[in-house]
Amino acid sequence: MRILGLDPGLRNTGWGIIDAVDNRLRHVADGVIRPDASAALAERLVQLHDGIMAVIADFSPDEAAVEETFVNMNPASTLKLGQARGVVLLVPAKSGLPVGEYAATLVKQSVVGTGRAAKEQVGMMVKTLLPGCLAATADAADALAVAICHAHHRGTQQKLARAVAR
């Protein structure tokens, strides 16, 4: 199972690809999509769309997972982030991928063991759980953490379904 993790943002959208087989995780790739900050909002959203489409085309994931965003004190920033998140949810869904959504606290809990972990702790645990991973940025590490969270929750859901079917 190849999973695309996405950490949405209008300035930087982190992405990470992992392979999850049974209980084993393997880092495939990661990076950041950086729309041109000087471009109009609509153009930045197009650049975000095109960047995610390129990642999907290059790595052929089976499923996607997106981190839910928190509401910020600045309504204008929250609205723009929501628009970017809409693109981040739409692209994999339009590509036929099932999309899971996870709260940041659940992602941190799944990867670090506490929902209040710092970004540095998340990055360190991602590198521990994915040997050989050198996550390019904190945004990429966060996206990989979202993918890891999805793999863990997906595996649990499959085990429950098998147990109920017996």
UniProtKB/Swiss-Prot annotation:
Q: Write out the catalysed reaction.
A: Endonucleolytic cleavage at a junction such as a reciprocal single-stranded crossover between two homologous DNA duplexes (Holliday junction)
Q: How is the cofactor bound?
A: Binds 2 Mg(2+) ion per subunit.
Whether Cytoplasm counts among this entry's keywords is yes
GO BP term, pick one: DNA recombination
The record's listing under PROSITE patterns reads: RUVC
Cofactors, names only: Mg(2+)
Top-level EC class as recorded in UniProt: hydrolase
Catalytic residues as annotated in Swiss-Prot or TrEMBL: 7, 67, 139
Residues the entry annotates as binding Mg(2+) 1: 7, 139
Which EC number(s) are documented for this chain? 3.1.21.10
**HAMAP family this protein is in?**
RuvC
Q: Which family does it belong to?
A: Belongs to the RuvC family.
Q: Its function?
A: The RuvA-RuvB-RuvC complex processes Holliday junction (HJ) DNA during genetic recombination and DNA repair. Endonuclease that resolves HJ intermediates. Cleaves cruciform DNA by making single-stranded nicks across the HJ at symmetrical positions within the homologous arms, yielding a 5'-phosphate and a 3'-hydroxyl group; requires a central core of homology in the junction. The consensus cleavage sequence is 5'-(A/T)TT(C/G)-3'. Cleavage occurs on the 3'-side of the TT dinucleotide at the point of strand exchange.
Q: Could you describe the subunit structure of this protein?
A: Homodimer which binds Holliday junction (HJ) DNA. The HJ becomes 2-fold symmetrical on binding to RuvC with unstacked arms; it has a different conformation from HJ DNA in complex with RuvA. In the full resolvosome a probable DNA-RuvA(4)-RuvB(12)-RuvC(2) complex forms which resolves the HJ.
The identity of this protein, by name, is Crossover junction endodeoxyribonuclease RuvC
Q: Which organism is it from?
A: Paramagnetospirillum magneticum (strain ATCC 700264 / AMB-1) (Magnetospirillum magneticum)
